[in-house]
Curated annotation (Swiss-Prot):
UniProt function note: This protein is one of the two subunits of integration host factor, a specific DNA-binding protein that functions in genetic recombination as well as in transcriptional and translational control.
Family label: Belongs to the bacterial histone-like protein family.
InterPro entries with a match to the protein in the record: Hist_DNA-bd, Histone-like_DNA-bd_CS, IHF-like_DNA-bd_dom_sf, IHF_alpha
GO cellular component, one term: cytosol
Species assigned in the record: Nitrosomonas eutropha (strain DSM 101675 / C91 / Nm57)
Name listed for the protein in its UniProt record: Integration host factor subunit alpha
Assembly, per entry: Heterodimer of an alpha and a beta chain.
SUPFAM superfamilies, A to Z: IHF-like DNA-binding proteins
Entries under Pfam families matching the protein: Bac_DNA_binding
One Gene Ontology term of the molecular function aspect: DNA binding
Region (Disordered): 49-71
Keywords: DNA recombination, DNA-binding, Transcription, Transcription regulation, Translation regulation
GO BP terms: DNA recombination; positive regulation of metabolic process; regulation of DNA-templated transcription; regulation of translation
Amino acid sequence: MALTKAELTDLLFENIGLNKREAKEIVECFYEEMRTALQNGDGVKLSGFGNFQLRTKPQRPGRNPKTGEEIPISARRVVTFHASQKLKSMVEANYRGEPNVN
């Protein structure tokens, strides 16, 4: 199961005491700022969580799996995420059943 924007809004409402409208605006604003930064070619660094970065992939040859015909796959930019060491350690500790140390 994945954590959704609606669930993030509910968590802000429950844990911080914001009303639902304010919580939704904060979540939307956060996502919009991340989108804008990435669209402008900037990375997004969230301390203790990870980095969102852009990677340029060059054009490369591909193949249509149905016909076997060679077709070019166009150059594009993709968003990558690299988890911080802190996040990786917390996930691994949880997987092993160890207590979570922040």
